[in-house]
Amino acid sequence: MSESRSMVEIFSDGACSGNPGPGGFGTLLRCGERVRELSGFDPETTNNRMELLGAIAGLEALTRPCRVRLTTDSQYVCKGMTEWIHGWQKKGWKNSKKEDVANRDLWERLLVLVSKHEVSWHWVRGHAGHAENERCDELARQAIADGCSSVV
């Protein structure tokens, strides 16, 4: 892919009050000096769905193909995209226990978005002082508190 593509950093986090229960996500996009924050709410969801939707929201906000560094504290999202997804596809969307892959709708949505960009996936430990991850966590928790549905 071309080096002329803009480099965008996306940070995302999901949260759930109960699992399942009301959930939210927070996403921060940074391109140079520009920063954009997104959040969303779902009244009945799971933590993993919110983690996926945080990444999806960030990628959906991009208006043209970009080089993307996507950072999340979700091993589920990070390993899902870097280690597991191709095996799931080969096995007809079955996991290692031969069960249907959870959240297939969101994984497929994420795959379509990733195909438009050059994405590298990065994991950070949650609640460990990573400024952007902490901000995304604040946005996700505020979305739950507000019950807002700005993106979902």
UniProtKB/Swiss-Prot annotation:
The keyword Nuclease applies. Binds 1 Mg(2+) ion per subunit. May bind a second metal ion at a regulatory site, or after substrate binding. It comes from the Bacteria. InterPro entries: RNase_H, RNaseH-like_sf, RNaseH_domain, RNaseH_sf, RNaseHI. Mg(2+) 2 binds at residues 13, 137. One of its GO terms (cellular component) is cytoplasm. Mg(2+) 1 binds at residues 13, 51, 73. Its EC number is 3.1.26.4. It is found in: Cytoplasm. Monomer. Belongs to the RNase H family. PANTHER family: RIBONUCLEASE H1 (PTHR10642:SF26). Endonuclease that specifically degrades the RNA of RNA-DNA hybrids. This is Ribonuclease H. The gene is rnhA.
